[in-house]
Amino acid sequence: DRIIIGSHSEDASNALTNLYQMIYKDKNNVKIEKTTPINAELVKYVTNAFLAVKVSFANEIYSFAKEINANYNKVIELAMLDKRLGTTHWSVPGPDGKMGFGGSCFPKDINSLINSFRDNGIEPKVLEAAWLRNLTIDRPEKDWLELKGRAVSNEDSE
């Protein structure tokens, strides 16, 4: 949907903008935005942390719905009629068939944001609660640890 380019160099951000415009020329809905590196980094953390919190919230609602014999899928289908809620990250279990969030980005990014909050004297209560729920209730097996140290590459990706 969007590409965020973080750079202090106008030449570099223009070059990247041109490259991405060539790559995504057939996709009119990809928006390219330029900003500072710190803003771009924070956008990534904010996006992933928000989605991680949303996954934790969905899992909590799922548990409650199950307990009171409500149909979680119907509740979410009807709740999503409110466009402010968005339509992604409501599936319980998730696309990997598991509860909570894993993968290579959500656990890393939510923890980076938690630590950055603390480093700046801010209590990250909501982020900590989502992380604690993920660790203790939804995904205590911590399967994301298996992904540490892996290389990012297109080789052998078939």
What are these regions (language model features)?
Residues 1-88, 116-123:
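Internal alpha-helical scaffold of NAD(P)-dependent oxidoreductase catalytic cores
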Residues 66-158:
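NAD(P)-dependent Rossmann-like dehydrogenase/reductase catalytic/cofactor-binding core
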